[in-house]
Curated annotation (Swiss-Prot):
A lipid is attached at residue 20 (S-diacylglycerol cysteine). Its main location: membrane. The keyword ATP-binding does not apply. It comes from Staphylococcus carnosus (strain TM300). It comes from the Bacteria. Residues 1-19 form the signal peptide. Keywords: Cell membrane, Chaperone, Lipoprotein, Membrane, Palmitate, Protein transport, Signal, Transmembrane, Transmembrane helix, Transport. Required for the insertion and/or proper folding and/or complex formation of integral membrane proteins into the membrane. Involved in integration of membrane proteins that insert both dependently and independently of the Sec translocase complex, as well as at least some lipoproteins. This is Membrane protein insertase YidC. The keyword Plastid does not apply.
Amino acid sequence: MKKKALLPLLLGIMVFLAGCDYSKPENRTGFFYNTFVKNMDNIIHWLGASFNNDYGLAIIVLVLAIRIIVLPFMLSNYKNSHMMREKMIIAKPDMDAVKEKVQRARTQEDKMAANQEMMEVYKKYDMNPMQSMLGCLPMLIQMPIIMGLFFVLKYPSPGGITEHSHFLWFNLAKPDIWITVIAGVLYFLQAYVSTFSMPPEQKQMSYMMMIISPIMIIWVSLSSAAALGLYWSVSAAFLIVQTYIANAYYSKKAKEEVAPMIAAYEKEHGGSGNSKGAKVVSKKNKKKK
């Protein structure tokens, strides 16, 4: 569900980005500009001055700082996702049975009873549906900040990047084909790495994102200052490392924590993972006893 909601969100962001033009001074007004873009511009200028007018380094430091700030939210999301996935191994038969009751319900009372039964299933397997629903929260929290930085780099203000534009082999204030290609490739790899631990039914949407994300990145970067391509490249590189390590760690941890529940389930049902009505006791419930 989260992946399905991500595509419309991405398309909405593309429309928003295409509709905003801060290249002209008279357009640099309004709540969003004054709250996010202007403040992010001030931070970039301060960092650039702090690094002896090295604005490429300033962009890298700012991107890493933002990623580190939202890292706890992202790690919590990885953990909850893997725990939910492991518990679904034994919870799915019960959940499918209740979903059938919801579909067959003809009255409001029947639907309410079925929904209440679904909540009991969640409780039985120590699952919190709100954790899955809030999985996009880290993205929503960082989105205004990221978009503010996007406009700062796409439409640099006078001074700063425009006057001290040299970094590595490219000009931060002008489009650069190679940093554009690097950004596109890295975003493709980031989407690809995220599929490693996904169940087959979720991979189809991820494959679509694997194509759409790089195309969007390349399309925007070709007509933007190379500073934007640098930002996307650093961000994608960080996400590749973060995704790979977090998925490897939390996948193993989730399997270890849920293993006793799966073992108890299989013992009661003779190793069958499709039987219904298993008396699964979570770790939290064990502690209460």
